[in-house]
C-alpha cells in the first residue's frame, strides 16, 4: 500500500513535468525526497541537472541516466519522454522487493541486463507481493 502511494505521487509529478514538455532522464530513489514528518508523506523529485525540454514529435539521442534505471531506448540513443516511465517501473520493482531488477558486478553487466530486459519476480522475495502488483511490474 505504501509503495502504491509513493508510485502514484511519482507518476503525478512526472506527468506534471511531461505536460510541460520536461523530461527528467535520471529518475532514481536518490532523486526522490520524502517528507516523513507528516501522516501522509509527500514526495519531491530533485536533481533536474540532466532534464531537458522536449517536443512530442521528436526523439532524443543524448545518453543520460543511471545504469540501474536507464531505459533500453536511451542506451540506443533513440528515446522520448517515456524513458521516465521505465525508470518509475524500476523504482516500483525496488519498492516491492528491495533490490533492482537488473543487476551486475559492473556497469557493463548492468547495462547488458537492461538491454536484455530479463528480470525475475518468482523468487522468495516476491512471495508476499500481491498478484496485481506482480502483474503491474510485468
Residue ranges and their predicted role:
Residues 97-100:
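Structural helix C-cap motif within protein kinase domains
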Amino acid at each position: 500500500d505504501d509503495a502504491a502511494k509513493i508510485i502514484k505521487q511519482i507518476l503525478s509529478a512526472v506527468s506534471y513535468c511531461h505536460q510541460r514538455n520536461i523530461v527528467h532522464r535520471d529518475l532514481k530513489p536518490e532523486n526522490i525526497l520524502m517528507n516523513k514528518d507528516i501522516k501522509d508523506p509527500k514526495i519531491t523529485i530533485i536533481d533536474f541537472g540532466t532534464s531537458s525540454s522536449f517536443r512530442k514529435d521528436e526523439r532524443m539521442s543524448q545518453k543520460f541516466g543511471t545504469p540501474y534505471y536507464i531505459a533500453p531506448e536511451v542506451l540506443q540513443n533513440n528515446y522520448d519522454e517515456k524513458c521516465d516511465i521505465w525508470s518509475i517501473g524500476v523504482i516500483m520493482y525496488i519498492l516491492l522487493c528491495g533490490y533492482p531488477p537488473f543487476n551486475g558486478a559492473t556497469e557493463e553487466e548492468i547495462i547488458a541486463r537492461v538491454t536484455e530486459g530479463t528480470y525475475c519476480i518468482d523468487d522468495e522475495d516476491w512471495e508476499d507481493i500481491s498478484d496485481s502488483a506482480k502483474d503491474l511490474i510485468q
